[in-house]
C-alpha cells in the first residue's frame, strides 16, 4: 500500500477529522490572556482533564515558537461539571494519608513509631493531589519566532543520531522488524565489552531471524562532542571548548548508548554522586531532543510556506515527547531543577509554586542507615503528575498534559489517570507519542508497586482515541502504523538490577537501536558476607526447579520451605526461640503465615507493611521476651522502617534480599543480641534458601564468582563463616 493510500485511509481513522496545512496556516493566535488572580480554581484543573479542549494546542502541530494554536472558546463549563463528578465520585472524603489512596501502595511509614520518617509535605488528601498534579496553564505565548538564531537550526546531518534514528530509517526495514516482533521471529545479536576491571556491558540489537546483521559496539569516543548538541545547550553548559573534557567516568560509560537512542539499564554505585552525574547527562539528552523536535517543526513550517506542495513528516499524534517516572516529589524536584538549570532558559513560570509543593529540607533520623536517609529525605509524597512546556523564552510548569513537552510523574500518580475505574474517564492519549522514557530510582519504585510501571508500558505509544488537533499530513508513518515502540528510547536507572528491571528492558522495550546493560563484577571482599564482620554460620541451601519454570518457582520454593525448613525449626538443635523469618514478597508472606497457622503448632507472630502500630509494638515486644518463638518479617516493612528487631538468635531468609544492605542489617540483629549477652554466635545460624533464578541477588550477597558456584555446582548446601 502506498503512503498516499495509507494516509487517505487514515484521514478518518477512529473518527479523526483531517486538519490540513492550509487550514492550520489560517488560524490566528489569540491575544494574550491575563490571570484574574493567583488562586487556582477547579476550572484551572479542568484544563488538564479535558483532552478535547480547544483552549491549548496539544499536538506537535504548531506555527509559532512554541507551536501553540490556542482558542479562547474552551469547553470550560462542561469540563468543570465533569471534573466535579470525578472528584466527588472518586474522593468522597479527604484521606489522612496519601498512600491510603491505593492499599497496594500503602507504605509502612504511615503507621510507624518514628514520626519523623512519616512526615510528608503537609497533610495532603487525594483531591488536593489531583489538583496539584493536573493544573492547567492559561497563558498565551506570543514569542517571536523570527528571533530564532539561524546558527542553531539543525543541519540535518545524517550522522546526527536524532536524524538517523527518527528520520532516515527505511520504511521497509521498519515494516519487516515490526512484523517480526508480531510473529516472534526476532532474535537479539549481542556484543560484550569491558568498562573496567569490575564492570562490563552487553549491547544487544534486534534482528529478523534469517537475516545477516553486524552488531558493533556502541562506543565511539565516549565524548559529548561527538553528538550534535543545540548551540543554546553548549553555551549554557560550558561545552564550546572541545579541548576540555567535561564528562565524568560514569558519564563516559553512558554518553554513547544514550545519545545514540539505545535503551539503557544502568546499575550505579553511589546514591548521591552517581545519581547526580547520570541525571546531568540525561537532562542534557532530553533537552536536546525537545529542542531538535521543535526546531525541525519550525523549519518545516517555513518550507511549507515557501512550497505548500511538499510533504514533511515530523510529528506524532500529540505533543508530549518525554516521560520521566520517579518515586517521590523529592526526586522530581531534583530532576526538574536539573532540567531548568541546563535549559538555557531564564524565565520559569510557577517555579515558586513548584518549589513550595515539591521541595522539603527535612531529613530522616541520623540513627537510620545512610541509604535510608537518602531515599526518604525531603518530600516523600508519591502522588503527582507535572507537565513541562518549553517555549522560546520560558519554561511553563504545571502545563496541560497535551500542551507539555515533558511529563514528570510518580507511578501512582499516572496510574490514577490511566486506570480510572470509570472507563469513560480514563486518559492515555497524552502518552501516544512518547519518544524518550526515563525511569529513575527503579529500586525505590519496586517497593511502592512495580505493577504500576508495567501499566504505564501498556499505555505507551498507542493510537489515540481522540484527534487532539493532529495534522495527519505531517504525522510520521511509523506512528500511524503503530510502530512507535520501535523508535522509543527507554532508560532505566537503579541501584540494584532485579528480575523486574530485566523484565522491563527485555520484555517491554522493542527499540530497533537495541539495548545496553552494564554488569557489576562483585568481589567476595565487597559482598555482603565479606563486609558483615560477624563470625557466624551462614548456610545457603539451593532448591531445584524442574524445567526452570519461572512461573512455578514460587511453588517449588514454598514446597522446599515447608518440607525442609519448617521441620528443621521444629526439631532444631540450636535455639528454639528468637527465630526471624525474613520474607521479601508479600504474597509469599501470606502463604507462609496461613500454612503456619493451619499446619503447625509453632508459636509465632508477624509484622508486615499493613500491620497496625499496636500490632507492630505488641509482636516485637513478645518476640523480644521469647513468648513468640518465631517472627515473620517482610522486606517492604524493613525498607520503609529499618526496624531494629530485638531478641533475634537465628535468621531464615525465605529468599535472598534484592538489596544487599538488608542482608547485613538483618544478620546484625543477631550480633547486637550477642553483644547484650543474650545469644551465642557459635550456636546462632543464618540460613538462606535460593534457586538458580536468584543469581542477581546472590552476586551481591556472596560475590560474583561464588554466586556462579552456588547456582550451578552439584552441591546444594554451602556454608560461610
UniProtKB/Swiss-Prot annotation:
The modification Phosphoserine is found at residues 53, 63, 196. GO terms for molecular function: rRNA binding; U3 snoRNA binding. Residues 1-168 are annotated as: Disordered. It is found in: Nucleus, Nucleolus. One of its GO terms (cellular component) is small-subunit processome. Residues 55-72, 140-161 have a biased composition (Acidic residues). Residues 15-31 have a biased composition (Basic residues). Residues 1-14, 88-105 have a biased composition (Basic and acidic residues). Keywords: Nucleus, Phosphoprotein, Ribonucleoprotein, Ribosome biogenesis, rRNA processing. Gene3D superfamilies: P-loop containing nucleotide triphosphate hydrolases. It comes from the Eukaryota. GO terms for biological process: maturation of SSU-rRNA from tricistronic rRNA transcript (SSU-rRNA, 5.8S rRNA, LSU-rRNA). Interacts with snoRNA U3. Interacts with MPP10, RRp9, UTP8 and UTP18. Component of the ribosomal small subunit (SSU) processome composed of at least 40 protein subunits and snoRNA U3. Belongs to the UTP25 family. DEAD-box RNA helicase-like protein required for pre-18S rRNA processing, specifically at sites A0, A1, and A2. This is U3 small nucleolar RNA-associated protein 25. It comes from Saccharomyces cerevisiae (strain YJM789).
